[in-house]
Amino acid sequence: MELAWHLVLIVLLSFSCWGLDWDSDKNFISAAGPLTNNLLHNLRDPLGNQDPPFVAEDEEIYVCRQPLPAFLPEYFRSVRASMITHYKVFLPWAQLLPEGISENPDKGTVLCYRQLLEALKTAQLQPLVVLHHQTLPASTLQRTEAFADLFAAYASFAFRSFGDLVEIWFTFSDLERVITKLPHQESRSSRLQILTDAHRKAYEIYQEKYAAQGGKLSVVLQAEMVSKLLLEPSTSVLVKDAVDFVSLDLSYECHNEADLPQKLSELQTIEPKVKVFIFSLKLQNCLSTGNDIAQLLFGLLKAINEDQVLVVGFDISTFLSCPSSSKKSWACSLSDSLTLQTALQLGPDTAAYAWPPCSAYQRVWEAFANQSKAERDAFLQDVFPEGFLWGVSTGAFNVEGGWAEDGRGPSIWDRVGHQNTIKGQATPEVASDSYHKVDTDVALLRGLQAQVYKFSISWSRIFPTGQGHNPNPRGVAYYNKLIDSLLDSHIEPMATLFHWDLPQALQDRGGWQSEDVVDAFLDYAAFCFSTFGDRVKLWVTFHEPWVMSYAGYGTGQHAPGISDPGVASFKKVAHMVLKAHAKAWHLYNSHHRPQQQGRVGIVLNSDWAEPLSPERPEDLRAAERFLHFMLGWFAHPIFVDGDYPAALRAQIQQMNKQCPSPVAQLPEFTEAEKQLLKGSADFLGLSHYTSRLVSTAQGDTCIPSYDTIGGFSQHIDPMWPQTASSWIRVVPWGIRRLLKFVSLEYTKGKVPIYLAGNGMPIGESEDLIDDSLRVDYFNQYINEVLKAIKEDSVAVQSYVARSFIDGFEGPSGYSQRFGLYHVNFNDSSRPRTARKSAYFFTSMIEKNGFLNKVVKRQSSPGIANIPRKIRAFTFPSEVPSKAKVVWEKFSNQPKFERDLFYHGTFRDDFLWGVSSSAYQIEGAWDADGKGPSIWDNFTHTPGSNVKDNATGDVACDSYNHLDADLNMLQALKVKAYRFSISWSRIFPTGRNTSVNTHGVDYYNKLINGLVENNISPMVTLFHWDLPQALQDIGGWENPSLIDLFNSYADFCFQTFGDRVKFWMTFNEPTYQAWLGYGSGEFPPNVNDPGWGPYRIGHTIIKAHARVYHTYDEKYRQEQKGVISLSLSSHWAEPQSLVPRDVEAADRMLQFSLGWFAHPIFRNGDYPDAMKWKVGNRSELQHLATSRLPSFTEEEKRYIAATADVFCLNTYSSRIVQHTTPRLNPPSYTSDQELLEWEDTSWPATAMNRAAAWGTRRLLNWIKEEYGDIPVYITENGVGLTDPELEDTDRIFYHKTYINEALKAYRLDGVNLRGYAAWSLMDNFEWLNGYTVKFGLYHVDFNDVNRSRTARASARYYTEVITNNGMPLSKEDEFLYGQFPKDFIWSAATAAYQIEGAWRADGKGLSIWDTFSHTPLKVENNDTGDVACDSYHKIAEDLVALQTLGVTHYRLSISWTRILPDGTNKYVNEAGLNYYVRLIDTLLAANIQPQVTIYHWDLPQALQDVGGWENETIVQRFKEYAEVLFQRLGDKVKFWITLNEPYVVANQGYGYGTAAPGISFRPGTAPYIVGHNLIKAHAEVWHLYNDVYRARQGGIISITISSDWAEPRDPSNQEDVEAARRYVQFMGGWFAHPIFKNGDYPEVMKTRIRDRSLAEGLNKSRLPEFTESEKRRINGTYDFFGFNHYTTVLAYNLNYASWISSFDADRGVASITDRSWPDSGSFWLKMTPFGFRRILNWLKEEYNNPPIYVTENGVSHRGEANLNDTSRIYYLRSYINEALKALQDKVDLRGYTVWTLMDNFEWATGFSDKFGLHFVNYTDPALPRIPRESAKVYASIIRCRGFPDPAAGPHACLQQEDAEPTASPASPVSQKIQFLGLRLSTTEAQTALNVLFAFMLLGVCGVAFLSYKYFKHSKQKHTQPGEHELSHRSSF
């Protein structure tokens, strides 16, 4: 019987060939069992004679008893290894429920059976559980009538007790036997009915209560009973209604071939069709030879096939037997059998019993080998299944960059990249910089419409050393942001744990050749599952491990560059990877799947292999072997049997036998490892690129190589098209064949296939945008995938294209571009530009295949809650209008208040959009029947004055690139797209008799594309491009155009109105009328400034009204849209608030906005201001009538209220002043009687200066003038001449303008509903041609494809849309809390800035004395000769300090006041005595002195000998310090050696803007000075530490200053590095040597050295410290004294190599954000957030030293400004950020404000005022007057921070509010303040009475006007949400 067993196993292997199946997720059932007592006896005695080990006849069935036999687990594993999938278990009803009731079970028996079932599950055997087989409980025999209920109760008990372990149940296995056991007083039919009822009840209970267990239930029937049971409805339930499948007890007569078909044919009568399981098969009259068994098996299969009975499995026990001599195992495994070929030869010869082909490869080959080329390449027009996933992929090391950012550790690819072995010496350091571009990449994915994004996690970014102990939080944050952003955009993340980039630290320990890496990978995987698994539901453990094994450890072409194919690759790496994968899968399966419900798989790569010579069997075998070596190496252990393919092992064994020494070693898996591996994937990810022709290896060689070991050689067909990669040829049909092979060999329809990588590269020399070859590649390959699904039934569930963007491609560097998006690696911002293939791929996703999508007309997203025909006012506007209140409210705002940034959000349904217009973007000027427009005619006419003679012939070519435009809109996340329709594209002649269907189709496609993506179309009917045919009959001067325009509009409403819900009739008619018919600059170039604009405007208003009524009457009810027109205006700000200028400003608005708005939104007529001015000037010009036409009363009624919303285009502001212009010649501009100009302080742009604050005022004016009408800003943007993608100025523009709109909405109640940025992309900007760029997207007009690339502003605008405004970030929220009790509060000054007395009492000259007395050095020629005269005002200064309540006072010592010549030869006692008195006074007032030894005022005598450039200064400084320690050290316990050495070195000796004013050695002097300053500090620190610390007990350190720097573009690696460099060169220059390692920062040393050498020098200009100096300098601090004021935006700036300066060495340029509040100092912007960030940077960079903020403050200019709100804002904000830093665990010990009082601010003299106290320099007494900020600072000190108002009033704040009470004896003044006048009480009483009378009249007037007002309108006021009004919104 040994051969028979082998044949059975072969048959089992062949079931997939026959198509026998259960369903899509369960294996075919091959059953054995149950356990019997005889079987257990034989298993206990393996040396004795034994029966077949899994055969069980009806001998006594084993009843479970504890403990279970110890050998059972091993036995079950051997059973499973023999391809048996299920095992029968018979439950003993009587033993489980001895009393017959489920309430009292035998718990021991229950536990025993659970253990038995668990043992089966552990062995991966599924239990087949029979509820009852033989013995009935006694209780059932006594109550036959209750049998059904008792059995149902027992069944319920069993389901409940074992259901979690059982999937298949049988109620009875032998009905006849049970019938005989029941009492015989009942008839047989009655007893059968009892059993039927019992079964039915059990089935119903399972379905009702236990269906969630997912199991199936049946009853075993004898085949002969089926037809009888079906005859009786009462028993037919046993066959079809109460079973999930039919289970048969079947006997087979071997000599009667018709026996089995006859029995099975009866099952065909059952409807609906049922599945059949052969529970037991009894053979009769059968021989036991292999030949007969083979005939029997295949006869059985033939019978099943012929009768089309769906057999889901059967009992194979009858066939199983091993020879009695077999002692080695309990089961005969397939590996022990004869070869398949031998078995086939032993089979029968008859055709009826032909052996099924069992080689998956052979079956695929035979299926496709004979295809004709036409048949093979036939294109399938069909779609993919619903739910098919489309995506793109990347790998971390390919795209992320940021190789050393934020704590990431190096990977093996970083190491290889730095070895200069990559093509072009490329490295992955920056790559595509995706680490900084999450928002950019996700936007592109949105535009692409990707449904899944496959990316990999950089192991070393999470665990820098690879070990899972300390995860890198910033790396984790990056992936959290990426995953969250993907999900927010409805993109499924598919995360790969390992994509070839092993942490270098692990490679140093052996890499994948070490078992340790498996454990490390498991820790890493566990962390990822735990951290990201709540959102990631698709996991890939390894990406293409074959590549890593083959190229990384075999050929050495990939990292880590090891060339050892025989041992490292085969023996170690692949083996470790497989074990790591399996362990990770089981980890997820056991610990994470229940909660996370995700799937874990692996991505394997494989080429398809065809035999080179199909007629040669050896080539056929070689091709199959190739697949086993490439794909089966990893797939076979995971998806088949837990072990390597037999072909792989046999080939290696054969090679090793042929060679004198082994060429390869294939390790063995233990049985446990095999069980771990088998089935350890929820899906098979497959990547495929190309195919190979394979032949058997020629010649004998023992040189180890992949091909040699495999015994094959690879070839290509020269006819296969080439790609940029030598290894990829285009062979589309290979992917279909590979998928079929994978399905047959590995997945068998049970495991889904995810196609996870397919694509081809283009080369650097090819067209980088037009990748038509790749489009063809995708088109063909995707179609072959579709064939595999539709025609071959392969379960492919996704297609993921490689690659999303260009990236680092390993050995080929950046020379091969796989991306759908081109990345410009020559640009530091790494911009991405969509290729043609991106748009093709999007079309595939949209259509889900290859059939043109049936367009279902969807309704556009509605415009929310627009009231109809709002008419707030029906009376004309006054002159000046009541809207003048806007100027009264806003024009006196201080600049700080005006510009302060406001945080909040817009209404939930706010409509965010972008704008464009037809002529500016469409191009295709004469394509597809379009007629010419006036702009076509104009631009084609010589002398048109369009810059560069540009035309709109092609423009952005949007007519031919609709897919690109939709891609951008989706990426932006806009909710609306405002575009215009080209009248001449719809009606070429302008008339409805000439409809152009091609043009209509274009707009239908555009509108459908928008609506499908939930983007509302906002359509402008006319945007200046009148059909030339209509211009030829007079254009807008011809009244017939009103009807023609209405006809055109009617057609558009009828054709597009079902989807367009927002219409605008005209765009900016003011410009249309003036520029086209006034100045004549625009076509039709009519120069008639006095009459033309008014005539045209008149026609336009009537045309608009006509169209409005057409829509209102014919379409509105059905289409439910809104209609208006877009009006434009700058804001008009009066030069002064004198009435004539205010009237002029109002008049400017009436002549621009009011010209069209007043008739439409008010009373149907022009504004009086316009009528009066034009009328009066016409009369003065002796004209009979006004040049402004008039409307009839009927026309007024027709025009009034013909707009549903107010659409506004605005860009800038103007300063306006009244003037009286000349009368002639008449002109629209002169009629306004005003002058207008832009303030030169406003930021310049290409066309208008930016004045964002005007937007808020203009919106308020509209509200006041036209009522509470919904307002949409339909154009707002900025033109720049710079085409760069880093358009920071545009970001600032939109940021500030949108913020002003937000203020108008939230603070002023303007009913603002939407905002559309101008413009989507660069376009034809009228007379400016293409020289001015307004686009959020750059368009390359030199590229025939007009490629579009997102600018930085696009990313910013998307961020605003995502946030629906500008909400306050969590980081910026105000923090309430207190500082520690011992926190130091201080105020600072400096000697030269306040003392004065410059020559008093023997003081010597300092360099600042000299500098300030040098012409043109200090603003206003100010000096510090007197300053605040603090030398004589100790008492006054003390009062100021006591007002603040500070605990400390930071002052500096004037070196020359102590040592007049700078040396210790003479000590000036008078000067020293001043400091003694000052310090004693402080101490007496309980104020501790913080003394700065040097604050920039070097003795001039020392400067005369070189100053800080002379190394002797180190000793002079030490001597000076020692004098101070000796004389003052007993009083002073807080010393600062130097203040801001950066300023001393760079500004004093580099720029020359500070004393001593040296600027001619900027590349050397600052570094020499800095060098000496550091050494001087160190020597003084050591002096104090060694000599004075012990007895004086003080602390000493240095004060270092630094701005914080943010990258200008955080997504640009160069900017990130520039910001880091800025801080290191400023703060790190001095901090690094002292606080870190005694030497300069590495970046300083490297850059200065490199630039010095580039200049031709032989060494660096930066001096070097000796090793002993480094040791002496390092650690010379007790605290970190830190001065900080502001933040900058930094970006890289490369200076010419010949420029030698600090700035050139640093290579950084800096700017500031326009939204940051100004101060009185040009260099100081208020940026509180930077304070917290730089404090945290100090903590991280210098190991959290104790930090004292020794200066922080803000300046103003101008008047005394006692109510210094800007300083209050600054102090509260900055100190609050310091409190947050404390919360961040920064060791912050104290805060010092700069400054106590106004003083001499160096080169700005007394102009910059930093003081909390105002010093009146015009008063000889120089009084110190506290500002409001002094009170606020005192309050903060008193409260130790910021008490939470939610906790109620705090005592510290109540002190602030207390007012002094006047003494009774105090005289009371008889004069009182009344309305700004000092009056007697009698005078005030009289005045009050008069005012009261006036007030009564006013109240009556207001009441009357209110009545009239509310009668005509309803006002709605939007109230700002309290939660959005931060402390910053108080203005």
Swiss-Prot record:
Where do the segments described as Glycosyl hydrolase-1 2 lie?
Answer: 364-858
Q: Which PROSITE patterns match?
A: GLYCOSYL_HYDROL_F1_1 (PS00572), GLYCOSYL_HYDROL_F1_2 (PS00653)
| Glycosylation site list | 370, 826, 937, 949, 992, 1014, 1038, 1176, 1345, 1421, 1510, 1658, 1674, 1763, 1816
Q: Which Pfam families match?
A: Glyco_hydro_1
Which residues face the membrane's Cytoplasmic side?
1908-1931
Superkingdom as given in the UniProt entry? Eukaryota
What are the GO cellular component annotations? apical plasma membrane
Task: State what protein this is by name.
Answer: Lactase/phlorizin hydrolase
Its lineage reads:
Eukaryota, Metazoa, Chordata, Craniata, Vertebrata
Gene name in the database record: LCT
